[in-house]
Amino acid sequence: MKKQCVAMLLAGGKGSRLSGLTKNMAKPAVSFGGKYRIIDFTLSNCSNSGIDTVGILTQYQPLELNSYIGIGSAWDLDRYNGGVTVLPPYAESSEVKWYKGTASSIYENLNYLNQYDPEYVLILSGDHIYKMDYGKMLDYHIEKKADVTISVIEVGWEEASRFGIMKANPDGTITHFDEKPKFPKSNLASMGIYIFNWPLLKQYLEMDDQNPYSSHDFGKDIIPLLLEEKKKLSAYPFKGYWKDVGTVQSLWEANMDLLKEDSELKLFERKWKIYSVNPNQPPQFISSDAQVQDSLVNEGCVVYGNVSHSVLFQGVTVGKHTTVTSSVIMPDVTIGEHVVIENAIVPNGMVLPDGAVIRSEKDIEEVLLVSEEFVEKELI
């Protein structure tokens, strides 16, 4: 049962900034890119990187996510020895142990890690869009003889205060770390991807659990303490597309990025496929009167109107004389006739009646997350 590396995937986030999209599901279960869920990218990275043992830590609204993951067969992670294991909070004698932070969620599942006695633990977040070979990061970690390796990316200075920010020497050794600083001194951001030497991780998680002043978070507590105690932390520089889709705006932007001819995120690469659960829908139907351009249209869609620069998930119907522009239409949405949709995200299963106009009244560039209340208001 011993494994060289076990991945722990944090997938319990509420995603409150995504508003109505996460009302009934955790953020990693939100649809993305015409046929995927956000978590597909991290799970596919694991599969493509040869990581065959993944613990998925869930908490907020887990039903949709649990049903989607199943036994992990979509990502070739339905293994007898290892594979995918969903790890929800659990009751221990007198109380339920809810996860209090990112570090707490790993600590509460030390028994899961103990059974594999790995050399390394890879800690991942299930709510980012990117392609990455974790095997190369592990090789880097071993080469640097690091205690901890953090994957890092340069972000815009205007965004830096949203991330864990660090400074590193030319050889990659991390010298300074601030979690979401108000006035960042660097734009080198943590991607929330860590490789720990297992004995060290276990030791510091046990120490952290005994600290009544800790918030039990990797960025706020564990990483600063490791630096303070002179452990060797290395920064692994990531080059490529990476998007934190934690807001309605950023989720829309990431979907629109897929439609660029020179997009950094290439879904059609054979060498690094992104796997998902097949929706088992019939082929899409595009009528002779329809016009579709620069768009992703998934299985089961029926299009009679005009669709431009948009992403349509499975089971979407677009009525006659309807125009959909620069929008993301989630699964099983029905759009009536003579409807106008611009710069919007339409959530799962919504029905838009004939004549509805869906666009922002304030700003032509603002992305609108459509709600039932908005549709009712438009029809008054």
Swiss-Prot record:
Gene Ontology process terms (BP): glycogen biosynthetic process
Pfam families hit by this protein: Hexapep_GlmU (PF24894), NTP_transferase (PF00483)
InterPro entries found in the cross-reference section: ADP-Glc_PPase, ADP_Glu_pyroP_CS, GlgC_bac, GlmU/GlgC-like_hexapep, NTP_transferase_dom, Nucleotide-diphossugar_trans, Trimer_LpxA-like_sf
Keyword Transferase tagged: yes
Origin superkingdom: Bacteria
EC number: 2.7.7.27
Induction and repression of expression: Expressed exclusively on media containing carbon sources that allow efficient sporulation.
Binding positions (alpha-D-glucose 1-phosphate): 99, 164, 179-180, 190
Recorded catalytic activity of this chain's protein: alpha-D-glucose 1-phosphate + ATP + H(+) = ADP-alpha-D-glucose + diphosphate
Pathway: Glycan biosynthesis; glycogen biosynthesis
Keywords linked to the UniProt accession: ATP-binding, Carbohydrate metabolism, Glycogen biosynthesis, Glycogen metabolism, Nucleotide-binding, Nucleotidyltransferase, Transferase
One MF annotation (Gene Ontology) recorded for this entry: glucose-1-phosphate adenylyltransferase activity
Keyword check for Calcium: no
Assembly and oligomerization: Homotetramer.
NCBIfam families named among the record's database cross-references: glgC (TIGR02091), PRK05293.1 (NF003670)
Function: Involved in the biosynthesis of ADP-glucose, a building block required for the elongation reactions to produce glycogen. Catalyzes the reaction between ATP and alpha-D-glucose 1-phosphate (G1P) to produce pyrophosphate and ADP-Glc.
Family in the record: Belongs to the bacterial/plant glucose-1-phosphate adenylyltransferase family.
Protein name per UniProt: Glucose-1-phosphate adenylyltransferase
Species name: Bacillus subtilis (strain 168)
Gene of this entry: glgC
